[in-house]
């Protein structure tokens, strides 16, 4: 265990806990402003190794960052254009939704009545309103266009962060009373978070591609969208892969049938088994140093504090908190509670 950098007595701990509550309330209140900055910071952490690799090949840092950001902007434009097209196509196919779902409901009606549930298809049809879904999709398209400005500001922030990286060590050293120990702790946090995010991103990309290929092979509509969803939600520990499987399974169940939905379910189970339970633990190596319970609770906490982005980044944020606690006398015991002793 590292030697404590900060010494705290009992009274200071109580005072700091009170301050912590106030700070957390402030963060939650200002989440709309803070979340883009945090997201940009973690994107910069993912991209910085690529920039460093280009710099080692004697590419000027400004040029390396410019090339990387240009590629990302082009990819984002193509991705948003495709998503807009997919949502438009989904809007056009919505009238089929009501007719497709009525067939299984008609087959289900006698079974429900047989077990004592008195319900008619006409009553259920009253609650199936495709107009509500069309309104929802229209709002999504509007939000997608509005998100362009937010994405531009986010990428601009990432750009300046990547350009600022060489100056950060010197700035941090001037801020610290004990720069050697402090920089060691910061470097450890950066290495841990970077290791997790880079590997998690690689695994998520492969997961999304495999899900896309599986759905395309089964002739599922919007397979690319569901593959993209599998990529994004794979960052959420424990439940992300489950959430990613629900929309395509529901779509296939409504439009294709029960057996086709079972086939898609089996495909997702196989993907999660191979990547979530076999490949990812092997690639991650010794692990994150966090217990399984802490990973799940951090998902809830950061989701409450920062919203969906907090859920996506719950693990790296908790890693940073754990390393910070290890550098304080009063926080080392809390850091032990967060740890997985089997992986220490």
Curated annotation (Swiss-Prot):
Biological source species: Escherichia coli (strain K12)
Localization, UniProt: Cell inner membrane
Swiss-Prot/TrEMBL GO biological process terms: autoinducer AI-2 transmembrane transport; quorum sensing; transmembrane transport
Disruption phenotype: Cells have a decreased extracellular and increased intracellular concentration of AI-2. Deletion of tqsA results in a 7000-fold increase in biofilm thickness and 574-fold increase in biomass in flow cells. Deletion of tqsA increases cell motility by increasing transcription of flagellar genes. The tqsA deletion mutant shows higher resistance toward crystal violet, spectinomycin, streptomycin sulfate, 2,6-dichloroquinone-4-chloroimide, chloramphenicol and amoxicillin.
Transmembrane feature ranges: 5-25, 31-51, 62-82, 150-170, 197-217, 222-242, 258-278, 293-313
Function: Involved in the transport of the quorum-sensing signal autoinducer 2 (AI-2). Controls the transport of AI-2 either by enhancing its secretion or inhibiting its uptake and consequently represses biofilm formation and motility and affects the global gene expression in biofilms.
Family classification: Belongs to the autoinducer-2 exporter (AI-2E) (TC 2.A.86) family.
GO cellular component labels: plasma membrane
Protein name: AI-2 transport protein TqsA
GO molecular function, one term: efflux transmembrane transporter activity
InterPro entries named in the record: AI-2E-like (IPR002549)
Location, primary (coarse class): membrane
Keywords: Cell inner membrane, Cell membrane, Membrane, Quorum sensing, Transmembrane, Transmembrane helix, Transport
Catalytic activity: (2R,4S)-2-methyltetrahydrofuran-2,3,3,4-tetrol(in) = (2R,4S)-2-methyltetrahydrofuran-2,3,3,4-tetrol(out)
Residue ranges, Periplasmic side: 26-30, 83-149, 218-221, 279-292
Membrane topology recorded in Swiss-Prot or TrEMBL: Multi-pass membrane protein
